[in-house]
């Protein structure tokens, strides 16, 4: 199970994110959103989780419980695996963790956005029962809003 990270884990998280999103930068031709912000302030409102050694994570999950209306969904701000861990089931494990965390927070769904230029990522989420809610055009990118319901009425 991932460990809750603190601001003391910032350097390894930043190094991890740079490695994990390096390929996306080349594909998209723009800076990935998770690499374009100052993480220091994010620790005040978001949950950071590390899988693997704290000083050299194999996976990182960043959740924003304040993004959606209370009680509705838990927003995945970032979910990533180290390049050498891809294809080993770690992404599935991290997504399972996110769903458990959403249930623990009494959320009905999990939501996220991804770039339209990453069809293999979109397909992966679709295989995990996410649905596409809408496309949004931003400067230099089109993002895909996705949602997975985890609770029934």
Q: Which stretches of residues belong to each language-model region?
A:
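Extreme N-terminal starter segment of soluble prokaryotic enzymes
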Residues: 1-2
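Acetyl-CoA-dependent GNAT
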Residues: 7-84, 95-97, 101, 136-139, ...
């Amino acid at each position: 199970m991932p460990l809750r990270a603190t601001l003391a884990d910032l350097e390894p998280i930043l190094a991890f994110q740079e490695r994990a999103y390096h390929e996306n930068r080349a594909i998209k031709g723009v800076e990935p959103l998770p690499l374009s912000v100052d993480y220091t302030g994010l620790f005040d409102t978001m949950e950071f989780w590390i899988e693997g050694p704290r000083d050299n994570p194999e996976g990182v999950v960043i959740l924003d419980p304040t993004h959606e209306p209370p009680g509705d969904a838990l927003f995945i701000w970032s979910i990533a695996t180290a390049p050498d861990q891809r294809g080993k089931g770690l992404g599935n494990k991290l997504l399972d963790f996110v769903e458990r965390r959403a249930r623990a927070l009494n959320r009905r769904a999990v939501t996220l956005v991804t770039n339209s230029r990453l069809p293999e990522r979109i397909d992966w989420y679709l295989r995990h029962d996410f649905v596409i809610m809408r496309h949004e055009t931003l400067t230099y990118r089109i993002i895909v809003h996705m949602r997975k319901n985890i609770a029934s009425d």
